[in-house]
A protein has these predicted regions:
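Bacterial Sec-dependent N-terminal signal peptides
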Residues: 1-28, 261
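N-terminal, motif-rich segments that launch catalysis or mediate targeting to/interaction with membranes
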Residues: 20-132, 146-261
């Protein structure tokens, strides 16, 4: 009986590990890396104001909140804020807008509510948590992908022989395969010269969206339906993932410093 209990225990650990490593949530790790890098580049004033508003919760921890509430029907109206679609060769400014909102509209609405002195503390906290997440989404190229394939979700591929889709490969699979915690990865990525930081933080939300869109077109050309992706794909593309995480963190810091610093 004792041996049976031990076997059941280790089977449970295996299932739990599998579930963790196949997280649907950039995955949780990616968003937390963006939040952690951003926190490291806040001004003293912004850091103090944010810590007071979030009551000690770190940006890395709140970065996944917008995904955690997705299953709650009360928050379904925010679903369209996680992505933005515009046609190939078309700039966001001139394209047709989603009447339900989109990633760029969502970011701007968060900024508006947070900066409004009349907004309640509860609303500021809620929209701040969304903002932290949405800036991360903006830097995952396929969150600016094509509507017809739902940002690569409809492009079925294999990742190390496991069935998945192209969106998930860029959201979480490559990051999880790198096998670092968010603190390890953020520490590994958080190095910039003064000039590099200034160059990355230059521009507007729309500029950054158009930049991600250009990357998305490259991502679409990187794989076909039913492709078997593994080490070579990781070698060719993980540098882009790391670059986008770094950009997301520094740009989130810029946005938050403007709001709170």
């Amino acid at each position: 009986m004792f041996r049976v209990k031990i076997l059941v225990f280790f089977l449970f650990l295996g299932v739990a590990s599998f579930a963790t490593n196949n997280s649907p949530f950039w995955g949780q790790t990616g968003h937390r890396v963006v939040g952690e890098i951003a926190y490291n580049h806040l001004t003293k004033k912004a850091k103090k104001n944010l810590e007071k508003l979030l009551k000690g919760e770190g940006l890395a921890i709140v970065s996944t909140y917008a995904d955690e509430i997705k299953s709650d029907k009360a928050y379904r109206k925010f679903s369209a804020w996680h992505y933005v679609n515009f046609k190939d060769g078309e700039a966001y400014e001139t394209g047709e807008k989603n009447p339900k909102g989109d990633l760029i509209q969502g970011i701007k609405e968060c900024q508006k509510i947070i900066s409004n002195p009349a907004s309640s503390e509860k609303d500021k906290v809620f929209y701040l948590k969304l903002l932290v997440h949405l800036i991360g989404d903006l830097h995952q190229p396929l969150h600016t992908g094509r509507a017809e394939d739902r940002g690569g979700n409809a492009i079925k591929v294999n990742w190390f022989r496991g069935k998945t889709n192209l969106h998930a490969v860029w959201d979480s699979k490559m990051i999880e395969s790198y096998n670092m915690t968010y603190t390890e990865l953020s520490t590994n990525l958080d190095y910039f010269s003064k000039n590099q930081k200034a160059a990355i933080q230059k521009g507007t939300i729309i500029d950054w969206a158009n930049e991600s869109r250009e990357l998305a077109l490259t991502v679409y050309g990187s794989a076909k339906i039913n492709d078997n992706l593994s080490y070579r794909y990781m070698y060719d593309h993980f540098s882009t993932v790391k670059s986008q995480l770094k950009k997301g963190g520094l740009r989130l810091a810029k946005v938050l410093n403007e709001l709170f610093g």
